[in-house]
């Protein structure tokens, strides 16, 4: 059963032996994982432990020497109960990570995500907390460390929208979006960086939006927050680079969701007309890119970058 933790009632978890990423240069037996995402050209998915075991066996047979064990990365994913966050948590869980599934209100959905990760053979903790509140963020990071000894990757995905035209926007609508979408990223990145600096390694992926690059009518608050995430992440990448901490941004465009499913035919036609590829992206598309940035040795030299995954909107 997945462990559920709320920020207001933090459950004491038994500490386990401290885990951590191997240095990239040591992971010669850990190749990029095959993804279950169609756009990666593969329909087969393997957990990290399976990949490592198979490769270690091959090396041992050829050299007669044992290959050092690669530990499962510990990942915190915020806003992971549905949509893009859910897809990211499941993708990383399938890849063999130990995943803390954060949610704000959707406890049942978050618990289901954790159960799916465990069904893949992984480990998961469900944590309820508001990432715009410093105390909740500190409790969330402590929960992951108490359970698994470290944090290797943080994916800041939690976010909200409060859409309306600028001339009608209330200050409360502005503040609410900025607090969660920008301040929440600041708090989680700051907390994660303190942990990662001590061990001189880590990866942080912040989910922004193509709206932060090109703007959108009725989303002045959202656009400002997401543009802020991009600039903030570039600065965090510069400050963390000397400690081998990679910070990158993913900027999705229109991604299929419950909201897009409810759009009328005329509105959908108008939206798709703005996308060169002529279709919505899928949450799994975003998850595949995040998995690469979070886990692949090939991403070790990438930092401070903002990747659009938008079907060509921002060309």
Curated annotation (Swiss-Prot):
Complex formation: Homotetramer.
Gene: bkr3
Catalyzed reactions per annotation: a (3R)-hydroxyacyl-[ACP] + NADP(+) = a 3-oxoacyl-[ACP] + NADPH + H(+)
Protein's recorded name: 3-oxoacyl-[acyl-carrier-protein] reductase 3, chloroplastic
Listed pathway(s): Lipid metabolism; fatty acid biosynthesis
Family matches, as NCBIfam families: 3oxo_ACP_reduc, PRK07231.1, PRK12826.1-2
Enzyme active site: 222 (proton acceptor)
Feature: transit peptide: 1-55
InterPro entries, sorted: 3oxo_ACP_reduc, NAD(P)-bd_dom_sf, Sc_DH/Rdtase_CS, SDR, SDR_fam
One of the GO BP terms on file: fatty acid biosynthetic process
This protein's record includes keyword DNA damage: no
Molecular function terms, GO-annotated: 3-oxoacyl-[acyl-carrier-protein] reductase (NADPH) activity; NAD binding
Gene Ontology CC terms: chloroplast
PROSITE patterns registered for this protein in UniProt: ADH_SHORT (PS00061)
Source species of the chain: Brassica napus (Rape)
Keywords linked to the UniProt accession: Chloroplast, Fatty acid biosynthesis, Fatty acid metabolism, Lipid biosynthesis, Lipid metabolism, NADP, Oxidoreductase, Plastid, Transit peptide
Binding site for substrate: 209
UniProt superkingdom: Eukaryota
Covalent S-S links between cysteines: none
List of residues binding NADP(+): 77-101
EC number: 1.1.1.100
